[in-house]
Amino acid sequence: AGKEGTFMKLPEKKQRWVYHDEVLPQPAGAGVTRRVLAYTDGLMCVENTFEKGAVGALHHHPHTQITYVVSGAFEFTVDGETHTVRAGDTILKEDGVEHGCVCTEAGILLDIFTPMREDFV
C-alpha cells in the first residue's frame, strides 16, 4: 500500500505505483466521478463511476478509447449505434467517432485512451 494519509487529485505523469484510495474522485458531470489512475504522453487509464441515470453526453475527441465495463449496465451509443453493455463487456471507440452513454444500473467504467487526454490533467 501507499503512504497512509496521502491523497491526490491526480497521480504524477509516469507514476509507477498508484493506489486507488489515494486518488480522490473528481466531479465529471451530474452523477459521475472520475479518477485518473495512470498516464504517460501516449496512454491514459481512467476510472469513471456512474450513478443510475447519469449520462455521458454524446461527444468525440481525437483519441482512440477502449472502455471496459467493470460493473453496472449502460446504454452506449457509438457512431449512431446503441447497445446495452454490462460487467465484462468492452467497447472500442476510434478517434473522432461520436459516442456517449446512459447508466441504467449504477456502475464503473475503466477507460484507456491513446494518446493521453490532456484535458483530464
List each language-model region with its residue ranges.
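Conserved short histidine dyad/triad with adjacent acidic residue
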Residues: 44-60
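Ligand-binding loop in jelly-roll beta-barrel domains
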Residues: 95-119
